[in-house]
């Protein structure tokens, strides 16, 4: 789909120079002399190589038309992830590398979004919010601080994050997966 370069947003996938590129970040620039332009940091989906490209604001770019479907995570066997479609029960397998560093969040029956381009799987996403149990953390000492502060914690999947002082071992928390940060304590 053809669009103006001014409409590029992070997270979009572009067809550029014969390949597919994920837009990582953009910066609009209006120099004192000359026309405005967009500086885009992009990642080649196939190779993972970064590309920094400059587009004139009025240039035409091609956004890739992607299909996105939700699947249910079943199990992982080696480097292969087995997923099932929730309505027709069709099972597919994807390479674990498609999840990149987010594979640590995989849990039974988790909903995984699989993105395809021309019937070829290009990447997969875990949900933005995942519930996990705190396995280890330091105890809270009342009056320890007057400002909000965080302490390290180890979660059930082995991941280490910073959590607020009031979180105890065995508490269930929600983690925001895009930046691997504490979001909230689960209210039961």
UniProtKB/Swiss-Prot annotation:
Subcellular location: Cytoplasm
Main location: cytoplasm
BP GO terms, sorted: peptide biosynthetic process
Alphabetized UniProt keyword annotations: Cytoplasm, Elongation factor, Protein biosynthesis
Entry GO terms, CC: cytoplasm
GO molecular function, one term: translation elongation factor activity
Matching InterPro entries: Elong-fact-P_C (IPR015365), NA-bd_OB-fold (IPR012340), Rib_uL2_dom2 (IPR014722), Transl_elong_fac_P/YeiP (IPR020599), Transl_elong_KOW-like (IPR013185), Transl_elong_P/YeiP_cen (IPR001059), Transl_elongation_fac_P (IPR011768), Translation_prot_SH3-like_sf (IPR008991)
Keyword Cytoplasm: yes
Pfam families: EFP, EFP_N, Elong-fact-P_C
Highest taxon listed in the record's lineage: Bacteria
Pathway noted in the entry: Protein biosynthesis; polypeptide chain elongation
HAMAP family noted in UniProt: EF_P
Family: Belongs to the elongation factor P family.
Function recorded in the entry: Involved in peptide bond synthesis. Stimulates efficient translation and peptide-bond synthesis on native or reconstituted 70S ribosomes in vitro. Probably functions indirectly by altering the affinity of the ribosome for aminoacyl-tRNA, thus increasing their reactivity as acceptors for peptidyl transferase.
NCBIfam families the UniProt entry points to: efp, PRK00529.1
Protein name: Elongation factor P
Organism field: Wolbachia sp. subsp. Brugia malayi (strain TRS)
């Amino acid at each position: 789909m053809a669009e103006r370069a001014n409409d590029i947003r992070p997270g979009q996938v572009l067809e550029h120079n014969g390949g597919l590129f994920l837009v990582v970040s953009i910066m609009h620039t209006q120099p004192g002399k000359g026309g405005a332009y967009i500086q885009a940091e992009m990642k080649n989906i196939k190779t993972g190589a970064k590309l920094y490209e400059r587009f004139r604001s009025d240039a035409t770019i091609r956004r890739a038309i992607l299909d996105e479907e939700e699947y249910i995570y079943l199990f992982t066997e080696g480097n292969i992830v087995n997923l099932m479609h929730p309505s027709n029960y069709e099972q597919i397998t994807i390479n674990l590398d498609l999840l990149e560093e987010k594979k640590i969040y995989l849990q039974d029956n988790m909903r995984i979004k699989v993105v395809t381009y021309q019937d070829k799987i290009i990447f997969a996403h875990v949900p933005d919010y995942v519930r996990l149990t705190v396995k280890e953390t330091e105890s809270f000492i009342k009056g320890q601080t007057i400002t909000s502060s965080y302490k390290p914690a180890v979660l059930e999947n082995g991941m280490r994050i910073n959590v607020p002082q009031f979180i105890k071992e065995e508490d269930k928390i929600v983690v925001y997966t895009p930046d691997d940060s504490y979001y909230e304590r689960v209210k039961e």
